[in-house]
Amino acid sequence: MLIVQTDALVLGNAQQLDMFFRQGYDYWGARWRRPVKIHSVEVRRDLWIFSAFPDIFWKYICRHPRYCFVGNGGLSLRNIKKTIALLREKKIYAAVWFDNEDKFFAYHGLKNHVNFRVAPEDMADSFSLEDFIKQRLNEAQPFGVHAWRRWAELQTIRYLKEHGYLSR
């Protein structure tokens, strides 16, 4: 499944998209500007206590920080079967997840028993960019860009216009 939010721009074509599907990764997304420190929770068996007594929720959390580099979901490609399998395996974590879904997949996609695979940093850059777009566009054109207006420099906008991705 291809996710394209309104602040994303697709630069590639169907053949490129098919190439990413065939590489065997279950989640493609842009590299984050800085590594994202993500905390998950270790959930006890008595999950009902979290909904019944939310004020003591934090007393039962054991945080496990992990730095994630890849996974921005604004322009992302997801294997539906593997995504569902991961959600089923991690359903107790998904029930209490308090952050964006892309961070869930980045975090739990690195350690699971359903063989869910997140594309590595160097390969993720070939799929989608979110920052340092001007420098990376000069190296190789990705399939698309996400949140490009947030980080766009004048040269990036000029490049996108010259190549027909933006109207002049």
Predicted feature residues:
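Catalytic core and acceptor-binding pocket of nucleotide-sugar-dependent glycosyltransferases
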Residues: A52-R168
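Phosphate-binding glycine-rich loops and adjacent basic patches that engage nucleotide phosphates
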Residues: T6, V43-W48, R63-V70
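A structural signal for short, well-ordered beta-strand segments and their strand-loop junctions
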Residues: L2-I3, Y27-G29, R117-A119
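Structural motif
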Residues: M1, Y25, G73-L75
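Conserved donor-nucleotide/metal-binding helix-loop-beta segment in metal-dependent transferases, i.e.
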Residues: L9-S51
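Short beta-strand-to-loop acidic/aromatic patch adjacent to the donor-nucleotide binding site
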Residues: M1-V10
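A generic structural signal for short, solvent-exposed coil/turn residues
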Residues: L2, F20-R22, L137
